[in-house]
């Protein structure tokens, strides 16, 4: 076993190694998946007069990932969800911050229905008050980080993972630029917020086009194979993050217990 190659290979890139058993993402016993239709296993059915949209949570990438890791995943998501709607009631409705649903890690995959709306203000980290989320601006950035802050309010030690938008799919003209801004915002938030990591599917994931795109999409949403692939990518990305930042995750087992303040000694 080559420990250096497994944990400290500087040439390894995220998703170079695709895991099917969750890998080191399995160090988390609970995940909260905050998102929209693509976090909800939504299938789209073609029909004349308007397509049908149906959330099949058992097919969501979160539930595929839970089955891989042997962990518990909570779907705090719904088709069409935005950061604004989440804060205006859905977060409470779905029980995101209920004591019995508090998670060790939260994976936030929101933004498609927010930033692709013409005229939507994406905002910047300057829109965020780290001391009082009630002062956050009414931009996507302000609302998105408020969701993060409320997660940290109920679980101060939770690890947060922010997902960028893959390339391809059904983006229309001009929307790729918005998705690029969203990608940069995720990095800016992670740097500002702390204990937060970016799952950059836009940079390291595949482009959803051609034969591949047609194979994993069903109309405008992913099919079962597409959601399974997404679960493998997100689990593999978290596996990569944990392996390359072992010190950051030494006390994961204490998250949500009375031992959260125990200091981890250094080895000589």
Predicted stretch roles:
Residues 64-72, 146-161, 185-199, 241:
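A structural motif corresponding to the C-terminal end of an alpha-helix
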Residues 30-34, 39, 72-77, 104-109, ...:
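Structural recognition of the beta-strand scaffold that forms the well-ordered cores
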Residues 37-40, 78-84, 112-117, 166-170, ...:
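Solvent-exposed loop/turn segments at secondary-structure junctions
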Residues 2-77, 95-97, 247:
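Serine-esterase "nucleophile elbow" of acetyl-processing enzymes
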Residues 85-138, 168:
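Oxyanion-hole/transition-state-stabilizing segment in secreted/luminal serine hydrolases
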Residues 165-268:
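Catalytic His-Asp segment of secreted/periplasmic serine-dependent ester chemistry enzymes
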Residues 40-56, 79-85, 124-134, 219:
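Acidic/histidine-rich helix-loop elements
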Residues 58-60, 86-100, 145-150, 184:
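Alpha-helical scaffolding within the catalytic cores
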